């Protein structure tokens, strides 16, 4: 489990990205890079890091399921993820 402060910081970044997304888009279309520079750093979508929604783990992230490989494996074995089953051939 990731530190709660790291998870909270990432959620704050996500909110800032959503808040400034429209303004950022308009400024880019106008080519006003000076105004873009004055926006908060955390409002840039490139600063976002994918984290597991259950544990907050930043590595081993599966985009399709929005969780880490470890959480995915646990839930898949329990049958809590629809459409996922253990492969065999």
Swiss-Prot record:
NCBIfam families: PRK08881.1. Part of the 30S ribosomal subunit. Contacts proteins S3 and S10. PROSITE patterns: RIBOSOMAL_S14. Binds 16S rRNA, required for the assembly of 30S particles and may also be responsible for determining the conformation of the 16S rRNA at the A site. The gene is rpsN. Belongs to the universal ribosomal protein uS14 family. GO terms for biological process: translation. Pfam families: Ribosomal_S14. It comes from the Bacteria. Keywords: Ribonucleoprotein, Ribosomal protein, RNA-binding, rRNA-binding. GO terms for cellular component: cytoplasm; small ribosomal subunit. GO terms for molecular function: rRNA binding; structural constituent of ribosome. SUPFAM superfamilies: Glucocorticoid receptor-like (DNA-binding domain) (SSF57716). Gene3D superfamilies: 30s Ribosomal Protein S14, Chain N (4.10.830.10). The keyword Ribosomal protein applies. This is Small ribosomal subunit protein uS14A.
């Amino acid at each position: 489990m990731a530190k709660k402060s790291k998870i909270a910081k990432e959620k704050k970044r996500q909110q800032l990205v959503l808040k400034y997304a429209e303004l950022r888009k308009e400024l880019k279309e106008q080519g006003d890079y000076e105004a873009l520079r004055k926006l908060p750093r955390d409002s840039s979508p490139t600063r976002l890091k994918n984290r597991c929604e259950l544990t907050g783990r930043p590595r081993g992230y599966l985009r399709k399921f929005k969780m880490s490989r470890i959480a995915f494996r646990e839930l898949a074995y329990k049958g809590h993820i629809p459409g996922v089953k253990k492969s065999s051939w």
